[in-house]
Amino acid sequence: VIILSKKSKSWAWQSFIIAHEIGHCALGHIDPDEILIDETLGEQSYALDDPDVDEQAADQYAITLLNGRANATYGNSTGNMSALGLADAAMQYGKANRVDPGHVVLNFAKHNDAWALGMAAIKLLQAGEKPAGIVVNDLLWRCIRPDVLPDDTIDLLYRVAPAE
């Protein structure tokens, strides 16, 4: 079970975190009965800057999974781009290469130290869409059986994944 606790409305952020956590599972970083809590969910959770070898490997796994290739980076040769321009370029690239445009934007933001621009482009890409957390949490609470879980587990789930 992967619980998304990053308070981001971005589908791209949430898909990266899921891919990162799947990486931990696929790479054998956790035992079947072990609970893993990834507490660093800021920019570094995307940046490959965490000094922990397992975290770097899970990040690399996620980037490869989301791009279909390892070590993917996206840059800007013009040096001057608007949020709309970045969103449009990411959408075109994403369609042509079957890569989520939001992931292209996050990757671009990290590698070009352009987080404000990236977050503005993410908002444009997600215009009119429900925030990721609302949809994911709704699915969790529709599928989970609280009657078979301990009360402290249910309390934790309500704190990290509140029902809307």
Language-model features and meaning:
Residues V1-E164:
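Active-site hotspot residues in diverse enzymes, especially metal/ion-binding acidic/histidine motifs
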